[in-house]
Amino acid sequence: MAWPGPLLLKDRKGRAYLVFPKEGGVFHHHKGSVPHEALLEAGPGGVVRTHLGEELSVHRPTLEEYLLHMKRSATPTYPKDASAMVTLLDLAPGMRVLEAGTGSGGLTLFLARAVGEKGLVESYEARPHHLAQAERNVRAFWQVENVRFHLGKLEEAELEEAAYDGVALDLMEPWKVLEKAALALKPDRFLVAYLPNITQVLELVRAAEAHPFRLERVLEVGWREWEVRLPVAHPRFQQVGHTAFLVALRRWKAS
């Protein structure tokens, strides 16, 4: 029996569960259990029932769903921010992108899918346990071999000059890597940083003035979901609040 990658199960209340099917495995729900073989037989888009009769729908997880439910060793980059970073970086298939601060690998997956099988993501993480978890997360969801993981700090890495089409940073002190990023980034391409607080934003923008970078924009990404139960519609009571600021810098040719 060929075992697929991760599957997402949803119960009648919309609660989601990420499952990695394996031979002899069993999924346990508070309203019963179901063997992994049954999930494979139902397949994505199908339905299974636990031994107590609870109905569960079976799905292939989207990238957003996978990021929200995968195991995490660090605070995740939310899907709304990761997709915005890909847009700000202006990535396309075949490009080469540099990432620092791999974390749990969520942003890495967005970058890898954006550059495609002919592109390349070079991801640096200084903490071994974060890097190990990130590599497991990425390999479980994304079978395309277009990500290289590196243990270490970006500022200490040996990089080719003007070899990258984009730089994505999720670091507490991204200003420390600006010199290295400027060396590696192609002219007229973008560096995008993910920063939780505005003090970090100000520090980064101030530091960028000493390097061949120009500030393009600073933004927050909103995400407002609605509850629609005919004939009633209203915003959901639980909303995603502030997650981070995104800072986009454009690399200029050094004068």
Swiss-Prot record:
Against Pfam families, the record matches this protein to:
GCD14 (PF08704), TrmI-like_N (PF14801)
Q: Which UniProt keywords apply?
A: Methyltransferase, S-adenosyl-L-methionine, Transferase, tRNA processing
Signal peptide segment: none
PROSITE patterns referenced in this protein's UniProt entry, alphabetically: SAM_TRM61 (PS51620)
Q: Is the keyword Methyltransferase assigned to this protein?
A: yes
Q: Which GO terms describe its biological process?
A: tRNA methylation; tRNA processing
Record's domain comment? Answer: Contains a large catalytic C-terminal domain that binds S-adenosyl-L-methionine and a smaller N-terminal domain that may play a role in tRNA recognition. Domains are connected by a linker region.
Query: Which family does the record assign?
Result: Belongs to the class I-like SAM-binding methyltransferase superfamily. TRM61 family.
Q: What's the stated role of this polypeptide?
A: Catalyzes the S-adenosyl-L-methionine-dependent formation of N(1)-methyladenine at position 58 (m1A58) in tRNA. Is required for cell growth at extreme temperatures.
For this entry, the protein name equals tRNA (adenine(58)-N(1))-methyltransferase TrmI
Q: Which organism is it from?
A: Thermus thermophilus (strain ATCC BAA-163 / DSM 7039 / HB27)
